Regions:
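Intracellular loop-helix junctions on the cytosolic face of multi-pass helical membrane proteins
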Residues: 1-21, 141-145, 169-294, 317, ...
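Cytoplasmic membrane-interface "Motif A"-like loop-to-helix N-cap segments
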Residues: 80-93, 322-340
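Short amphipathic helix-loop junctions that connect adjacent transmembrane helices
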Residues: 38-57, 271-299
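Hydrophobic core of transmembrane alpha-helices in multi-pass small-molecule transporters
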Residues: 27, 98, 110-131, 358-380
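C-terminal ends and interior cores of transmembrane alpha-helices
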Residues: 90-110, 337-359
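Transmembrane alpha-helices of Major Facilitator/SLC transporters
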Residues: 69, 207, 288-327, 338-346
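Central cavity-lining transmembrane alpha-helices of secondary-active solute carriers
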Residues: 61-79, 163-165, 304-317, 407, ...
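A gly/Pro-rich, aromatic-decorated transmembrane alpha-helix motif that marks the paired
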Residues: 38, 72-73, 160-176, 350-351, ...
Length: 422
């Protein structure tokens, strides 16, 4: 199948069939990542590893920071040497190996299992993450009106995987009674479930890629490809010209937005550490519900709240910006609203923490509130980031400043680990 045939091999909704194949692969990869993420900080403070919450938070922050850094190298290697599709295969294999290594703590030293497993996941994510989204982009011509809708469908896969993972991996892996010896060592089943999810996605990808993708993403980008690419030609021409005062002002604006985004992501990533600890230690996990009666929750289940809110609210926010038309808030306004809404969320959980100090475990509503407002803040700020870069960055430095935007997540996660540890 030629590249052109791939782009025109569509469903009744007009989107390329290859999009839905990639949707499934991404869904299982995110199931793999978010299933592990829901358990990681709790696993590190368990009797298996025995870290303090401070140490656990620092390691978690470093891990999630590096997850955002390695895709820069992975994308470069795929473009120049390996090819995007081979990189996806390598990344999926490494991430699955990482999950099963995490689950091997009874066979090898638990600290060694933890360090090796996380390292494999970090490297695997670097090969996988940038290349699958790039292939989605290659399913469309640059000005194809289906492109935005296609990416919306693709990113829905992220949230579907992220929603189900905490329930399945948490149910299998998080002990209900840590004092029970058999229960205390069931973490491995959660990590094995996450790794199995990645293997399912990998098998689906290997079986389906030739049928749906043709030659798209199969080979590295050659010098001739770059010479024939109109965008690369435009960058080459722009590179010969010095930056104007207006471009320097836009660069300063980018760094200003990145600075504030660092703090947003630092608090947003408390979900995996301090909010996870709050769920485990300060939240009533056996509430009595009307009609249903008493239910038993696990701390890891709350990691599913953000993705379900994203699924519910993302279409509403998209319609809101569209409906506002020319009154659509500016980029600084959206950043401001994002930080403000996040602040409301953490004010709510602070009230919950005060009630816990006074009366013991509190209602889960306080955690749900912080996730609700943080999700609304995320929808104001996070999608605007790359869009802001493409609007403001000089053409010849476009790739560089896309990388600069990713550093907001990198430094934000480092700061998140430090905040949670203190």
């Amino acid at each position: 199948m030629t590249d052109n045939e791939v782009k025109h091999n569509v469903t009744k909704h007009g989107q390329p069939k290859a999009l839905y194949m990639l949707f499934m692969v991404e869904m299982w990869e995110r199931f793999n990542y978010y299933g592990m993420r829901a358990l990681l900080s709790l696993f590190m403070i368990s009797t298996v590893i025995g870290f303090t919450k401070a140490t656990s938070s620092k390691i978690y922050g470093m891990f999630t920071a590096l997850v955002y850094l390695t895709p820069v190298l992975g994308g470069y290697l795929a473009d120049r040497y390996i090819g995007k599709r081979h990189s996806i295969t390598i990344g999926a294999i490494l991430m699955a190996m990482g999950q099963f290594t995490l689950a091997s703590y009874e066979l090898i030293n638990p600290i060694l299992a933890l360090g090796t497993g996380l390292t494999l996941i970090i490297i695997g994510n670097g090969f996988f993450k940038p290349n699958i989204s790039t292939i989605v982009g290659e399913l469309y011509e640059p000005n194809d009106p289906r492109r935005d809708g296609g990416f919306t469908i693709f990113y829905m896969g992220i949230n579907v995987g992220a929603f189900f993972a905490p329930f399945i991996c948490g149910f299998l892996g998080e002990p209900t009674d840590p004092m029970n010896v058999l229960e205390a060592y069931k973490w491995k089943y959660g990590f094995m479930a996450a790794g199995t999810g990645m293997l399912i996605g990998l098998v689906w990808y290997l079986v389906s890629q030739n049928k749906y993708l043709g030659h798209i993403g199969l080979h590295p980008v050659t010098k001739n490809d770059q010479d024939e690419d109109p965008e690369e030609k435009a960058k080459a021409e722009a590179a010969k010209k010095p930056l104007t005062d207006e471009e320097w002002d836009k660069i300063k604006a980018i760094f200003t937005f990145v600075f504030f985004a660092i703090f947003f992501f630092a608090f947003f990533e408390q979900a995996g550490t301090s909010l996870n600890f709050f769920a485990k230690e300060a939240t009533n996990l056996t509430p009595v519900l009307p009609i249903i009666g008493q239910i038993t929750l696990k701390a890891s289940y709350f990691q599913a709240v953000n993705p379900i809110f994203v699924v519910l609210f993302a279409p509403l926010f998209a319609k809101l910006w569209l409906k506002m038309g020319t009154k659509d808030p500016s980029i600084p306004s959206k950043f401001g609203w994002g930080l403000f809404l996040q602040g409301i969320g953490f004010a709510a959980v602070a009230i919950g923490a005060a009630l816990y100090q006074a009366n013991g475990p509190v209602s889960a509503i306080w955690l749900i509130l912080v996730y609700l407002f943080c999700t609304m803040g995320e929808l104001c700020l996070s999608p605007v980031g790359l869009s802001m870069v493409t609007k403001l960055a000089p053409l010849k430095f476009m790739s560089l400043f896309k990388g600069v935007w990713l550093t907001a997540s990198f430094f934000g996660n480092l700061l998140a680990g430090w905040l949670a540890s203190s």
